[in-house]
Amino acid sequence: MITTRAATPADAPAISALLTELDYPDTSHFIERRIAELLAHPDERLLVAEEDGALLGVLSLHFIPQLAVEGDFCRISYFCVNSRARSKGIGRLLESEGEALARSRGCDRMEVHCHSRRSDAHRFYYRQGYTESPKYLCKSLADDGREGDKQ
């Protein structure tokens, strides 16, 4: 039976493996710390799905208050189901749990950024009722090599 629960720092190795499936580089050296930070943050939720003790999926949610509209929104930050466990309803279960959490927090919408190459994920989100929205623009704040900021 597939169940969901809040993640714990002990889930770090399995979550790191799932993030690798999303083409994120090795997260093993910091993932446990990041999980603990997210779990302590009041506007974050980290859910996992498991079956017979094996962690098969992860869903990271961020609740964002809004200024100009009454309802807040929930952003799916990371969402992955183990590639060998897909099409078993795990993603649908996690997304449904996430939606229930968002509604309980007063959110009136959910959003997800999904890379253009993830066509299977796009089909999943469309089936769950998501629609495309306006383009997002991003600015990297990573070190760009400018010497002026270094001490």
Which residue stretches match the model-derived regions?
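A short, internal acetyl-CoA/4′-phosphopantetheine-binding micro-motif in the GNAT/acyltransferase core
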Residues: 79-86
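Conserved GNAT acetyl-CoA-binding A-motif
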Residues: 95, 102-114
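Acetyl-CoA-dependent GNAT
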Residues: 9-71, 77, 97, 140-141
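Residues at alpha-helix boundaries and the short loops/turns that link adjacent helices
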Residues: 21-25, 88, 131
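Conserved acetyl-CoA-binding loop-helix of GNAT-fold acetyltransferases
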Residues: 87-100, 127
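Conserved N-terminal entry element of GNAT/NAT acetyltransferase domains
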Residues: 1-10, 143-151
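Alpha-helical interaction/dimerization surfaces of two-component signaling modules
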Residues: 18-22, 101, 124, 128
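Conserved active-site alpha-helix within GNAT-family acetyltransferase domains
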Residues: 92, 116-134, 139
